[in-house]
């Protein structure tokens, strides 16, 4: 079950203010700009404990999308996820609508037939599309294919290298496995895009996860970069480094 942005704002003003102060993206911007392949070859880094504020989250089984800011950029998404969220996603792939209203900020798409090589360490290189419509809460965790639940992300931000278990997939896989093993439990799951100034494409996403038994309790930054390429985060364009 998902709640729309309008429904989410029924929370009282005090709670909304707490949410905004709790999640200041500027806090994480220096880290978002510090990525190197050598230190984070799978495009994520564990920052520490989740710091989850439980009263900011919806009832069990629900997801609240934070909507869009004045520039049309996706904001923080929070969900209190259960096994039923995962169960409802089995064998279902939701496609994003191709409409102007659902176009992600900074999204220019991929040219037909264009294939790019993003080199990793050793043999872990990716070959394929450069950009993905990257979910904040994955469809495998019950997230919807909506503009308010996605960003313009590099392929490596979405899944890491060729192995496909890095980037956003790191917390997604861990969370799905935990929910499948703890069918009576629940997870607080939060994904916050990190923007620099008025740029339309985020520099990173900070994902915070806390399980009801506290065996998962971590905050992870996922870098929206691609080794060997320079990205224009204002325009959503990129070029290969010489």
How should these model regions be labeled?
Residues 29, 40, 57-58, 192, ...:
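Intrinsic-disorder/low-complexity coil detector
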Residues 63-70, 74-242:
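Domain-level detector of nuclease and nuclease-like folds
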Residues 1-54:
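N-terminal, intrinsically disordered, polar/charged segments of Gram-positive cell-envelope systems
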Residues 51-63:
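Early extracytoplasmic/domain-onset interaction patches
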């Amino acid at each position: 079950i998902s709640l729309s942005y309008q429904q989410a704002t029924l929370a009282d003003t005090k709670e909304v203010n707490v949410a905004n102060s709790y999640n200041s993206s500027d806090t994480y911007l220096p880290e978002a700009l510090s990525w190197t392949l050598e230190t984070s070859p799978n495009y994520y880094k564990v920052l520490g404990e989740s710091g989850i504020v439980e009263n900011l989250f919806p009832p069990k089984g629900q997801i609240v999308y934070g909507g869009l800011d004045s520039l049309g950029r996706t904001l923080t998404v929070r969900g209190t996820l259960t096994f039923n969220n995962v169960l409802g996603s089995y064998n279902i792939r939701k496609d994003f609508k191709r409409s102007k209203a659902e176009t992600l900020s900074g999204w220019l798409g991929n040219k037909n037939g264009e294939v790019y090589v993003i080199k990793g360490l050793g043999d872990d290189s990716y070959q394929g599309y450069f950009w993905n419509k990257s979910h904040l809460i994955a469809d495998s965790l019950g997230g919807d294919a909506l503009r308010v639940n996605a960003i313009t992300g590099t392929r490596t931000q979405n899944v890491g290298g060729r192995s496909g278990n890095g980037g956003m997939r790191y917390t997604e896989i861990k969370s799905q496995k935990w929910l499948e093993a703890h069918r009576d439990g629940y997870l607080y799951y939060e994904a916050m895009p990190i923007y620099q100034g008025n740029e339309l494409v985020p520099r990173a996403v900070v994902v915070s996860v806390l399980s009801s038994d506290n065996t998962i309790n971590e905050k992870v930054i996922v870098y929206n970069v691609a080794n060997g390429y320079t990205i224009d985060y204002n325009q959503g364009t990129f070029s290969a480094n010489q």
